[in-house]
Every structure is written in structure tokens, then in C-alpha cells.
Amino acid sequence: MRVWLASLFLCALVANSEGGSELEASDESNCGCQNGGVCVSYKYFSSIRRCSCPKKFKGEHCEIDTSKTCYHGNGQSYRGKANTDTKGRPCLAWNSPAVLQQTYNAHRSDALSLGLGKHNYCRNPDNQRRPWCYVQIGLKQFVQECMVQDCSLSKKPSSTVDQQGFQCGQKALRPRFKIVGGEFTVVENQPWFAAIYLKNKGGSPPSFKCGGSLISPCWVASATHCFVNQPKKEEYVVYLGQSKRNSYNPGEMKFEVEQLILHEDFSDETLAFHNDIALLKIRTSTGQCAQPSRTIQTICLPPRFGDAPFGSDCEITGFGQESATDYFYPKDLKMSVVKIISHEQCKQPHYYGSEINYKMLCAADPEWKTDSCSGDSGGPLICNIDGRPTLSGIVSWGSGCAEKNKPGVYTRVSYFLNWIQSHIGEENGLAF
């Protein structure tokens, strides 16, 4: 009872002090107030000091800026309240037991200067690309970039290109246009690669369906033949930043398909697929489009009717089978190099004859040892045009895999630029 009365008396004194009886402490260093906060003590308890924060700031030291909804630069000075990663998963508090085992936590001697404290707000204490936090995934804690916007992107874009901070065709790793044959790779080599999965019932993991390419922050280009038998957008989920299929990849983003557009003149009545192009509009569960990162980037579109010269080396990427006799798709992303073949050669009778038209591109390994195969459908054919990686083709069809005189056939993207723009619109972030 005495304890309760004492507590009540203390609360009354504190309440009274809030009404105007607070006194400024003579030594503000004892509080460590930031952002214009004033160190104050109570009239009857002068040894108890705290920070009185200006409007818009809160926290023990007024270190949290409640008005900040975006970050500047790389966000090292960000002190806002974003507290989820790019997939909407909650951040761990910097003073939580799990985080205390990590390098950056609230118990560091420099925690206050780094923005760390008794909260779970996103920070960038180690000068990374953007604000991040620790997220619990299974039994482990992972560093995850946060769902918070770059302030420079909140301004109205000056053009239709690069409106989300992307730089099309830019890789985190050095370009690899000289490899011979296929090899397993990481998505940093093809950061525009999109993995499209078909949802399964009963809670089982989704099944890999096709590849695609991120052509703007909200749009993925793929092949119509991937979806004609199951055209409902709700049946698909799209991942960016995946190096391993059906596995968690740090930095990956998951999207629902908001809109699925199949080409109205698609035809598969013969061996060939005609007008084999599709567009998927993607959004996260929180309504976000793709965010640029080391593993996620857009790919440049080609000039109108501008294609790589015949004989050019181009890259193909996917989770497709390594041969026509394989039953399972590989777990790791694979990249190969093929050469563009002329229409005249590809239309030869011992190639594909009259099945080839001007809306298609042919490409193959001169040794016929590597090729796109089942499971690579919809994925990118990336060629160097005017010094930058460009989406020249979309994996469409072919006879077998790496068969002699049977090159892979790709949708010629430069022919379909008007179709793409007519469906996406002008303010789209496309880069040509």
C-alpha cells in the first residue's frame, strides 16, 4: 500500500511538472539530447533528468524523427520510423536478445550516434546502399533492406525513363560476354531476371513456370505461351533477385501479378510460336513495385528495329533443363552465351524453313553444345547494343535443346516496342 501511495505521489509530481514546473538542467550533457531537445529535471526530483523533445521528434534522446518518410543519399542519416523489410516482414528491435549477438545493436558504445536504440526502426550504421534492419527468418537473423523510399524518387520524374532510380542494364558484377558454354551463375550477373512460379494448392511450394525480364519497376516481359493454358493472373507469383530456385535468396522480392497481358495475335498452330510476348504487372503485398538493388535491376529495351548484328555474342539465362532428356529443372540459375544467326541461315530448309519470320530472332552456340531449353521459356536474350546490355529477345521455341542446325528461336523485342508501350503507357520507367 505504501509503495502504491508513493508511486501515486510521484506521478502527481511528474504530472504537475508537465504543467509548467519543469526546470532546465544546468548540465545538458547528462541527457545527450539531439535535434534541439532540452534536458530538463523535475522541481522536486532534480536528479531525474530527461529530454524534452521538439514537435516531430521522440525517443529517449529525441533521436527519432517521426516526420521522415524517406531517406537521403544512402540513408546513413535516416532516423525515421520505417520498420519492415521490402517484403513487409517486421524488423527486430536493436536491443532484442537476438540482435545483441549481431555486430550492430543498441548496446554498442556508439549506438546513439548510429541511430540504434530501444526500437526496431531501419537504420544504416555501416554505410550500406540504403537503410536496413535485422529480420528473423526461421532460426536465423538476416540483414534485409527496408521498405522506405529514396527521397529523390518522391519527386516528379523529369522524363519517362528511370523514374524509380533504376539504371537499366547495370550489373553489380563485371559483364561476362566472353564465357564459352553454359555455367551456373548468380543473379547479380542478370539482375533483371524474373522467376515466374505457378501457385500450388494445399500450401505446397509453388512450381517454377517460366522466366521473364524486368523492363520497368512494375512490369516484367515474358512469353505468352507460358500462360495460355492457365491465363488467370491470380495463379502466379513472381520473384526478383533469385539465384536459387525455391530457396530463400537474400535481397529477393516477391510479387503478386496485378495484370497479365497476353498478345492478342499469339498462335501456336504450327511448330513455331507467333507473337510470343506477354507482360506482367507486378506488386508486392504492400503495393510496391520493384526496388533497385545489387540483385534487382531493369534491362534496357532495344532501339526500334535495332538488333545486334549477326554473329554477336548474347547471353541467355534461366532455370531450364540442361538437355531435352532431363526431367528436373536445376536448382541454380544458369547462364550461357549464344551467337545471333541471320534470318537467311535460320530459314534454310535444314534449319526451320518457312516457320521463321521477321518477328523472330535465331541464336545458337556454334558448337551446338549449349542452348535455351525447356524451363527457359520467357527468359531474356541479352545482347550488347550501343555498349549496354539490351533485351533483344525472349526465349520462345525451338526443336530439342542444342540440336545441330536447330537454334533457339526468340521473340524479336524491337518489333514489339509499340505493343509494349500501348499496354504499359508513357509514364512507365522504360529505358530504350
Swiss-Prot record:
EC number: 3.4.21.73
GO molecular function, one term: peptidase activity
Gene Ontology CC annotation, any one: extracellular space
Post-translational modification: Produced as an inactive single-chain protein (pro-uPA or sc-uPA), is processed into the active disulfide-linked two-chain form of PLAU/uPA by a proteolytic event mediated, at least, by TMPRSS4.
Notes on how activity is controlled: Inhibited by SERPINA5. Inhibited by SERPINE1.
Gene3D superfamilies: Laminin, Plasminogen Kringle 4, Trypsin-like serine proteases
Positions of modified residues (Phosphoserine): 158
Disulfide bridge positions per record: 31-39, 33-51, 53-62, 70-151, 91-133, 122-146, 168-300, 210-226, 218-289, 314-383, 346-362, 373-401
Pfam families in alphabetical order: Kringle, Trypsin
Database matches in InterPro entries: EGF-like_dom (IPR000742), Kringle (IPR000001), Kringle-like (IPR013806), Kringle_CS (IPR018056), Kringle_sf (IPR038178), Peptidase_S1_PA (IPR009003), Peptidase_S1_PA_chymotrypsin (IPR043504), Peptidase_S1A (IPR001314)
Region of interest (Binds urokinase plasminogen activator surface receptor), residue spans: 34-57
Localisation: Secreted
Family (UniProt): Belongs to the peptidase S1 family.
Role of this protein: Specifically cleaves the zymogen plasminogen to form the active enzyme plasmin.
Stated name of the protein: Urokinase-type plasminogen activator
Annotated organism of origin: Rattus norvegicus
Name of the gene encoding the protein in the UniProt record: Plau
